[in-house]
Amino acid sequence: MYGKLEIGKSGFKLYGEKFYLASGDIHYFRIHPSSWENVLDLAVDFGLTAIQTYVPWHLHEKKQGHFDFWGQDGELNLKGFLELCDKKGLKVLLRPSPYICSECDMGGLPAWLIKRGREIYRCCDADYINAVENYYKRLCAEFLPFLSTNGGPIIGVALENEYGGYGNEEGYLLKLRELLSENGVDVPFYTTDTFDSLMLVNGSVDGCLCGFNFRSTPSETEKALELLGKLKPEQPLFVGDFWCGRSQMWGEKYSPRDPRETAEAYKTALNMGAYVNFYMFAGGTNFGFTSGSLYGAPFTPDKEKNYPRFLPYTTSYDGDALIGEDGNPTEKYFLCRDILDEYLGKAKRPHFIDRKKSQELTVKLTEAASLFDNLENIGGEVRTTVLPLSMEELGQEFGYVLYETRLNGSESWTRLRLVNSVRDRASIYLNGEYKGTYTRDGGNEPIEFTVPKSGIKLGLLVENLGRCCNAAVLGEIKGLVSPEITVNLKNSFNWKQTSIPLNNLNAIEYKSNFRKEKLLNYPVFLKGEFEAEAGIDTFISTEGFTHGNIWVNGFNIGRYWNAGPQKTLLVSGGLLKDKGNIIEIFDTEYGGKTEIKFLSKNLLY
């Protein structure tokens, strides 16, 4: 059927008939395609009529002008996801960036936008708008056939994301609408902002449906919807993001939201006549290096640690959602489903759905390889400069950079200080020997050592843990970013930089006769082969490993870290074969383990 969503004070109409909008966020790029159908079936069972999803610019155009709508294994196949939504009878609310936040690296903006001294985003800056225009031309061609006006499932398209909390340039939002319209988008546009009258004024434009975002507590729900009703009496009460949980951060305690409170808040919203979108309805995974970070105070019950600092997000994007990262419905799912059923006059249903099957395995790690022995095989660009270059200046988005310099032997003892220099984590080596690790905002002490008369080579393996996604610090650079790299209060010059994006491990030269004692505390790749039941999920336990990433059959599952709270990494069953599966682990400070366990459940906090 062909038609356009009609928006009136009393609600919505589609194809000339009343349409009840019940929606939730499910992000195609955070779920392996083999699991899309499971979560969409659960959405239908719940009673949703639409799915909302962001479109991540930073993943679809990692390199300027090079577009990717497939990813590692189909997780960026936007067309495939839209087709499946349509098949399931679900409409779609599409949020096509540019900025999406969503705890993504740089809020979904691609790193190639960064230019030192010119961090201008989310406005009508000519360079920025030109980049958006080129992206939209390609992106719109991808989803235009799926607009409801073309017989597809997309009934609404968002302009930006919570812009009212960042800027006040109405012309910018109008420009985005103009660009989308010029590329054929003719369904209604909408905006969402944190509930505040000024944010709504700054973040909305005439002719667009306006929504509020807020936490799922009864009191906040009532306040937000009362304010929205006063500010926008001509439209339905629309909740763009009903925050029913929150994201995890490495090294922080995690407090799930009370599912009964969320259900009560949902009931409050429905009884006030609101149309609610759950954020998140289904959790997911920040595959590879794609998670972002926050610079600010954490959401933690530990008051002693509640001060502003750098906080990288975990690989898991479970988000305390109604459907967990593992694809199973939670208590929150059933309680909120009860509320919707009651509101719509449906019969009460039992709280039971078959859980997804999972499997346990133990895998021997029979091969190993030193990162330093394989730099020529997997390293990227190598450059030597007086001052260190940032990751972005090396043309790199994610991963690691090895910085090396020579220290003269004129001092009997030496003190190394990295003042505001490391973004975000650095393993430190002297003549190849591990000496310690610096972390950004980690309260690190200076490292002291002796330099022989012949001098010594200093090496810093620096990792990007995710660019900040909060608006105030967009566009931060990564790597060694400051000249304040001092040895005995003297600046260090003449640096060799080796780019290590870890986007292809095929050329690594593994050895089966390795001695683990010689590899302890060094950056090491480990490899093992295993059998499994194809199509069945499992969860890799990272106990005994320090920090790094894991690949299964070439797919970068994501980052692990013994800082916690996340203790497992999800492996979608769609990645597994019955035989010949390969696991590869990169550990920045190898601890000596030669086997790894796969569990039947997710351990997130």
Language-model regions, residue ranges each:
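Active-site neighborhood of glycoside hydrolase catalytic domains
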Residues: 128-205
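An active-site-proximal structural segment forming one wall of the substrate-binding cleft
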Residues: 74-94, 117-154
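N-terminal carbohydrate-binding accessory modules
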Residues: 1-50, 83
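Catalytic-core region of carbohydrate-active enzymes that cleave or remodel glycosidic bonds
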Residues: 215-324, 328, 339
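Aromatic- and acidic-residue-enriched segments that line the glycan-binding/catalytic groove
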Residues: 65-73, 97-123, 173-177, 207-210, ...
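Aromatic-lined substrate-binding rim segments of carbohydrate-active enzymes
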Residues: 36-105, 177-182
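Aromatic-lined ligand-binding clefts that engage carbohydrates, nucleic acids, or primary amines
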Residues: 414-430, 458, 530-553, 560-561, ...
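A cross-kingdom feature marking solvent-exposed beta-strand/loop segments within repeated
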Residues: 310, 329-332, 393, 411-415, ...
